[in-house]
Swiss-Prot record:
Residues 287-294 are annotated as: G4 motif. Residues 47-377 form the G-alpha domain. PANTHER family: GTP-BINDING PROTEIN ALPHA SUBUNIT, GUANINE NUCLEOTIDE-BINDING PROTEIN SUBUNIT ALPHA-13. One of its GO terms (cellular component) is melanosome. Residues 347-352 are annotated as: G5 motif. Its main location: membrane. It comes from the Eukaryota. G proteins are composed of 3 units; alpha, beta and gamma. The alpha chain contains the guanine nucleotide binding site. Interacts with UBXD5. Interacts with HAX1. Interacts (in GTP-bound form) with PPP5C (via TPR repeats); activates PPP5C phosphatase activity and translocates PPP5C to the cell membrane. Interacts with RGS22. Interacts (in GTP-bound form) with ARHGEF1. Interacts (in GTP-bound form) with ARHGEF11 (via RGS domain). Interacts (in GTP-bound form) with ARHGEF12 (via RGS domain). Interacts with CTNND1. Interacts with GAS2L2. Interacts with GPR35. Interacts with GPR174. InterPro entries: Gprotein_alpha_12/13 (IPR000469), Gprotein_alpha_su (IPR001019), GproteinA_insert (IPR011025), P-loop_NTPase (IPR027417). The modification Phosphothreonine is found at residue 203. This is Guanine nucleotide-binding protein subunit alpha-13. Belongs to the G-alpha family. G(12) subfamily.
C-alpha cells in the first residue's frame, strides 16, 4: 500500500503557518538577511570611531586626511597621483602671480628689467578660464608659462618679495614647487607622495575617509575651514567620538585671507573657544594639534611673537617658550577647567612619520577614553 502523503492544502489547513510557498520562503529568507544586515550595521555604528577634523582654513586638515590614507589605507596609485598634477600646476602659477604682484606693490626693483615682460605674461593669465577657475591648469598650458616662471623665480626682485611674504598672502608650498620646476616641467610628470601632500586646494563641502585599525572602524571627516564653509560643520556633529582641532602654529603674525585684517591665531582661538565650550561636545575627546612645527621653528628665529601678542612672556626666539605660550592660550579658552583633559600634540602634517607616531598616541587616547561607548572591553 502506497504511503499516504497529505497535500499542501491539507497541511495548510491542519498546521497553518507551517507550510510556505516558494515565494513566501524566499521572502522570509530575504527578511532574515535584512535583519542580519541591520544587526551588523547597528554593531558597526556602536563601535565606529568618528573623528571630526576642525580648524581654520589652511591649518592642515586636508593634508592630515591625505596622511591617513597613506598610513592606514591605500596609497595614491598612479591615476590618483595624476589627478593632482593640474592642481600643482595651478598652485605654481597662482603663487608666482602673487609674487609678481607683491614685488610691484612693495616697490621692489627687478634684478633684471627684462623680466617685466615675463611678469606681464603671468599677470595676463586668464584665471576665469573653466579649468583655472576650478584651481586646475593643463600640462600644455603650464609648459607654455614655464620659461617665464623659471626666469622670474631666479630674479632677485622676486626673491626679495618672497623674503617679505608675511606681508601678503602666499601659499606655504609655493617655494617647494618653484624649487622643483625641472621635475614639474617634464611632460609626463607624475606627482610624488610629497608633492601630493603639499598640493593645496581649498576644501569645499564634506570629505570622509573610512579605515580600520585592529578591527575597529574609523571614520575621519574633513570640513572646509574657511568662514564660508563653517556653516557645514553642524552637519557633522552627530555621533562624534573625538575632535582633532588643527591650528597653524606658525601663523601668529599673519592675517586671514578672507578679510585681510583678523590675526590668524586669534581666529583659531575664537573658533576653538566656541567648540570646546559647546555642550554638545561635553563627552567628546578634544585633541589639539599645533601644526606646522617646522615652519614655526623657522619663524621664531626671525619674528617676535611678542609684537603680536603683548601678553607673551619668555624668549620670543625660543621654540619651547613659544609652544608653551600657544598651549596656554588654548587651555585658557576652556570655561570649565574641570572637564575632560585637553590633549595636545606638536605636529608637521606633511611629515608622514611624524603623523604616524602622533596618530598612534591619539588612537590610544581615543579608544581609552571611549572604551565603554565603543563596547571594546
Amino acid at each position: 500500500m502506497a504511503d499516504f502523503l497529505p497535500s499542501r492544502s491539507v497541511l495548510s489547513v491542519c498546521f497553518p503557518g507551517c507550510v510556505l510557498t516558494n515565494g513566501e520562503a524566499e521572502q522570509q529568507r530575504k527578511s532574515k538577511e535584512i535583519d542580519k544586515c541591520l544587526s551588523r550595521e547597528k554593531t558597526y555604528v556602536k563601535r565606529l570611531v568618528k573623528i571630526l577634523l576642525l580648524g581654520a582654513g589652511e591649518s592642515g586638515k586636508s593634508t592630515f586626511l591625505k596622511q591617513m590614507r597613506i598610513i592606514h589605507g591605500q596609497d595614491f596609485d598612479q591615476r590618483a597621483r595624476e589627478e593632482f598634477r593640474p592642481t600643482i600646476y595651478s598652485n605654481v602659477i597662482k603663487g608666482m602671480r602673487v609674487l609678481v604682484d607683491a614685488r610691484e606693490k612693495l616697490h621692489i626693483p627687478w634684478g633684471d628689467n627684462k623680466n617685466q615682460l615675463h611678469g606681464d605674461k603671468l599677470m595676463a593669465f586668464d584665471t576665469r578660464a573653466p579649468m583655472a577657475a576650478q584651481g586646475m591648469v593643463e600640462t600644455r598650458v603650464f609648459l607654455q608659462y614655464l620659461p617665464a616662471i623659471r626666469a622670474l623665480w631666479e630674479d632677485s626682485g622676486i626673491q626679495n618679495a618672497y623674503d617679505r611674504r608675511r606681508e601678503f598672502q602666499l601659499g606655504e608650498s609655493v617655494k617647494y614647487f618653484l624649487d622643483n620646476l625641472d621635475k614639474l616641467g617634464v611632460p609626463d610628470y607624475i606627482p610624488s607622495q610629497q608633492d601630493i601632500l603639499l598640493a593645496r586646494r581649498p576644501t569645499k563641502g564634506i570629505h570622509e575617509y573610512d579605515f580600520e585599525i585592529k578591527n575597529v572602524p574609523f571614520k575621519m571627516v574633513d570640513v572646509g575651514g574657511q568662514r564660508s564653509e563653517r556653516k557645514r560643520w553642524f552637519e557633522c556633529f552627530d555621533s562624534v567620538t573625538s575632535i582633532l582641532f588643527l591650528v597653524s602654529s606658525s601663523e601668529f603674525d599673519q592675517v586671514l585671507m578672507e578679510d585681510r585684517q583678523t590675526n590668524r591665531l586669534t581666529e583659531s582661538l575664537n573658533i576653538f573657544e566656541t567648540i570646546v565650550n559647546n555642550r554638545v561636545f561635553s563627552n567628546v575627546s578634544i585633541i589639539l594639534f599645533l601644526n606646522k612645527t617646522d615652519l614655526l621653528e623657522e619663524k621664531v628665529q626671525v619674528v617676535s611673537i611678542k609684537d603680536y601678542f603683548l601678553e607673551f612672556e619668555g624668549d620670543p626666539h625660543c621654540l619651547r617658550d613659544v609652544q608653551k605660550f600657544l598651549v596656554e592660550c588654548f587651555r585658557g579658552k576652556r570655561r570649565d577647567q574641570q572637564q575632560r583633559p585637553l590633549y595636545h600634540h606638536f605636529t608637521t602634517a606633511i611629515n608622514t612619520e611624524n603623523i604616524r607616531l602622533v596618530f598612534r598616541d591619539v588612537k590610544d587616547t581615543i579608544l581609552h577614553d571611549n572604551l565603554k561607548q565603543l563596547m571594546l572591553q
